[in-house]
UniProtKB/Swiss-Prot annotation:
Pfam families: Ribosomal_L31. This is Large ribosomal subunit protein bL31B. One of its GO terms (cellular component) is ribonucleoprotein complex. The gene is rpmE2. Part of the 50S ribosomal subunit. SUPFAM superfamilies: L28p-like (SSF143800). Belongs to the bacterial ribosomal protein bL31 family. Type B subfamily.
Amino acid sequence: MKPEIHPTYQKVVFMDTSTGFKFLTGSTRGSSETIEWEDGNTYPLIKVEISSDSHPFYTGKQKLADAGGRVDRFKKKYNL
């Protein structure tokens, strides 16, 4: 590999801001915020709005998002 053209791969902590769930993984993304992890080391902290802990597909709490009655208009249009 050519030197100095690839991003730095490091361990980071992702935190789901809606649930507070945190997980440690590898990423090329960095952050100025840091957090001390369970192992005593400090890692960059990346905040995300949705993760597998809060996403409706993974939690089983899916519901139909009807924006402005579009589903009703579709059903009415096609007599469903």
